[in-house]
Amino acid sequence: MPAALEIRGLTKSFPGFTLGPIDLTVPEGAIYGFVGPNGAGKTTTIDLIFGMGAKNAGEIKVLGLDHLRDEVAMKQQVGYVSPDLNYSPWGKVGRVIQFVKGFYPTWDDAYCDQLLRVLNVGKHERIMSLSFGARIKLSLILALSWRPTLLILDEPTVGLDAISKQEVFGELLKAVGDGERSVLISSHGLADLERFADHVGMIKRGKMIFEGSTADMIERHRIVDFVLGSDQGADRGHSIAKRDGVFVQRQEANRWRVLLDLKTAPLEWLRESGATQITEAPVTLEELFVAIGRE
C-alpha cells in the first residue's frame, strides 16, 4: 500500500531528551492515531515533518516528496491543525477565510460553507469571541476547505465537548472517504481514536513502542490474570515480568495482572512458565496506552 507519510530513522537530540530513531508509516487513505504521554515526542515529530528544526538523521517522505527539498510542493498538499494556531489578528471568521483562500487554488467555497454550518461557526463571528473549542473547529475548517491530500492534526479535540468531537471526527471520516486523502492525528483522546482511527502508533520517551492497524493492536494484546504457586519462587515472577511484551498491572502475593502482547509473550509461554488459573480479557486502546505508558 502506498504511504502518505513515511519516516525512517528520524532522530533529533536535545539536552536531556533524544527523539528516535523513529520509523512511522501512514498508509494512503488512513486515519492514523499518533499517541503517547506528554513529552513523548509527538509534537517534535510533527514539527520536523514541516521543517521546523533540523533533524540529526533520518528521512521524511510526504506523499512521495522529500519534506525539505520539495517543501513548497509538499505544503501545497498538506493541511495542518493545532491549538497553537492563532487567527485572531484577522478579526472575523469571514475575513480569515478570504485570506487563507487566496493561497489555495483548490479551495472549495461550497465545502467551506458546509463545514461552517455543520461545525456551527459563523462567518460574522469575531475570532476573539469564539470559545477555545470553536477556534479549533475554525482551524479544521480552514485546513479542510482546500481539500489537502494529507491532513496533520496536533491535539485537534482539545476543548471540544462530546458532541463537537463526534462532529469533527465525522467530517474527517468524510474527508478520507474517497480513499485519496489521509489523516495523521496526534491526540490524547484515545476513546475517540479507537472508534475512528484505523491505524495507530505509540511513542514513549522518544521511541516508537508499536505501530500497526488499530484492530491488530487491540487484537494482539490481552489483560491476563494468573496465579504463580508459592513454590515458583521470586525468580520466576521476576523472569515473567522482564519478558518483552509483558506489562505488569498489579501483583498481590502470588496473584498477578499483566497486559500481554501475544505476539512476543503468548499465553502458551505463560503456562510453560508455571502460571495457573489464567483468565484473559480484551483490551481497549486506552487501557493499552495506560499500561504501556506507566512502564
Regions found by a protein language model. Name each.
Residues F169-L262:
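ABC transporter nucleotide-binding domain
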Residues L151-P156, G233-A234, T264-E268:
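Short, surface-exposed beta-strand/loop "edge" segments at domain boundaries and coil↔beta transitions
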Residues N254-E295:
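C-terminal coupling/interaction segments
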Residues P2-I7, K12-I185, L190-K204, I209-F210:
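ABC transporter nucleotide-binding domains
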Residues R8, P27, V227-G229, D261, ...:
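A structural detector for beta-sheet-dominated domains
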Residues T11, G94, L190, D231-G233, ...:
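Alpha-helix N-cap/helix-start and coil->helix boundary motif
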